[in-house]
Amino acid sequence: MKVMKLKSCFWLIGLLLVCNVYAQELCRADFLPKASAAFDLLTQKYSEERIVKEIRAKNVRWVTNLMSASAVFYKATHEKRYLDMSEQVFGNAIREWKKNEKLMHGKDDFFALQNLALAYEILQDNDRLPMGADEVMIRFADLHFDPDFVIDNNQGQERALGFVRMCNLFPDAPGVSHWKEYVDKMWHFWYRNKDVDETATLYASIHLNDIINIAIESDKVA
C-alpha cells in the first residue's frame, strides 16, 4: 500500500514538473508571427475595390475593424504594409462618408467608433491622416451618440470606449461634454455591479477588455 502511494506521489510530482516546463515554454513563446500569418490569410483578398464596396454597403463594422486591426499589427510588427493597409481603408472611408454620411450607419455599428478612433490615433502618430478627417470623425461620433443607450454588455461598453477615445482625441469638440457625461454614466452603471454579465466567452472577454481600457484611458485608475 505504501509502495503504491509512493508511486502515486512520484507520478504527481512528475506531472507537475512537466506542466511547469510547458507553462514556462508557453510564457516564452512568441505568438505574433502566428497572429500575423492568420491576419494575412484573412485579408489576402482585400483590395481597393472590396474596401469601397463594403463602405458603400454600410458594412461599418467590417471597415472599422479592418482599419484598426491593420493599424495594431503595424504597431506590433513595424511592418509598413500594415500601416499602408490601415491608411488605405481609413482614407477610403473618410472620402465616402464625407460624400454620403448615411454610409456611416450599418449593422452592429456599436463596435465602430472605438475601432475608428484607434485607427485614427495610430495613423495620426505616423502622419498618415487624410485631409478633412477630423470633421468626419466628429460627425461620425455625433451620429452614433445616444445618451440613453445604457446597458451592461459589450454593446454598451464598446460605445463607451469609443467616446472615451474621442474625448481624448478631440477635447475641444462641440459635443465633448456630452460624450464625457455618457462615459461616466456607463462607467457608474457597470461599477455598481462590478461584474461581466455576458454568458458567451467571446463577448465576456470583449466586455472585460473594454472595461479595462475605459478605466485606463479615462484615468479612472491610478
PLM feature segments, named:
Residues 36-47, 82-91:
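Non-catalytic all-alpha helical scaffold/repeat segments
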Residues 45-57:
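Extracellular ectodomain segments of secreted/surface proteins
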Residues 28, 35, 48, 133-134:
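Short amphipathic alpha-helical segments that mediate assembly, nucleic-acid/protein binding
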Residues 11-20:
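Bacterial N-terminal signal peptides
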Residues 21-25, 29:
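Boundary at the C-terminal end of the N-terminal hydrophobic targeting segment
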Residues 54-222:
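Aromatic-lined, polymer-binding surfaces characteristic
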